Each structure stands twice: as C-alpha cells, then as structure tokens.
Amino acid sequence: MQQYSILVLHGPNLNLLGKREPNIYGSVTLDEINLLLSEEAKNLDVTVTCVQSNHEGILIDTIHQAWGLHQGIIINAGAYTHTSVAIRDALSAVKIPTVEVHLSNIYQRETFRHHSYIAPVAIGQISGFGVGSYRLGLLAIVEYLRKLENNH
C-alpha cells in the first residue's frame, strides 16, 4: 500500500485560532490542530504537510506546487471559501482529490457563508465539528485514496 502525502491548507485568520471568536471556532490553536493531524497521520501511515497563509496567492502557489508531490489536499480556505474563484480554479487545475473542511457549520452562519466556490471541485465537504472536522477530513481523504488505489 502506498504511503500518501496529504497537504493541509489553512486560509486567512486561522493563525488566530484559540484567540479569535472562541464561541465560534473554539479554543484550540492552529498548532494544536496541526499536531493532532500529524498524530492521526502516523496512525493512518500517511504524512501531512500543513501550510497556513493569509494571502490568496501563497495558497494558490502552494496548491500548484502540490502537483506530483501530494496525493490529497485538505483545505480550510476560511473566508476565501466564499470569494475565491482563483483558489477554486487552482484546485480544479491540479486535479488532486480535495476535502474542504470548516470548524463551524457554515450553513448555520451568515448567508454569505452558505456558498462555497471550493465544494464543486472537492470530493466532499465537512463542517461544524470543530477540530474534528480536520480529523474527519483526513480520514475521508485517506479512505478515498485507498479505495482509488484498490480499484486500479
């Protein structure tokens, strides 16, 4: 069985987790999320590379650089979820299976957050489970990749 490399992208303002609106996003920091993902990745015999940026272009460049390097992407694009056609197009261009995750349930929040440009090019979307959304996203992408491998 192939060991998969998964890119985890955290978008704008996620570097403030633990301080920013804990009533919505919880008290866990981004470093703690990354540690949890690294530990879960070891259990699944995969590797994760975590990148956070507040800049759309850096996120896009990182997606482009993932081509041929990573077999899956987990992305929490933050507010770019609802605004960035460019991130959507980058994900579509590289054709790397992607799971979109959100800490909060975006459909229980402001109406403008109900639309995702990423969802149509992702294999799935997980939201509303706090830090668990990331863990579920990792489990989902690994299961998807293993099924894909077994079907070939």
Swiss-Prot record:
Belongs to the type-II 3-dehydroquinase family. This is 3-dehydroquinate dehydratase. InterPro entries: DHquinase_II (IPR001874), DHquinase_II_CS (IPR018509), DHquinase_II_sf (IPR036441). Substrate binds at N76, H82, D89, L103, S104, R113. Pathway: Metabolic intermediate biosynthesis; chorismate biosynthesis; chorismate from D-erythrose 4-phosphate and phosphoenolpyruvate: step 3/7. It catalyses: 3-dehydroquinate = 3-dehydroshikimate + H2O. The record marks R20 as: Transition state stabilizer. The keyword Lyase applies. Signal peptide: none annotated. Homododecamer. Its EC number is 4.2.1.10. Catalyzes a trans-dehydration via an enolate intermediate. Keywords: Amino-acid biosynthesis, Aromatic amino acid biosynthesis, Lyase. CDD domains: DHQase_II. It comes from the Bacteria. It comes from Gloeothece citriformis (strain PCC 7424). The active site is at Y25, H102.
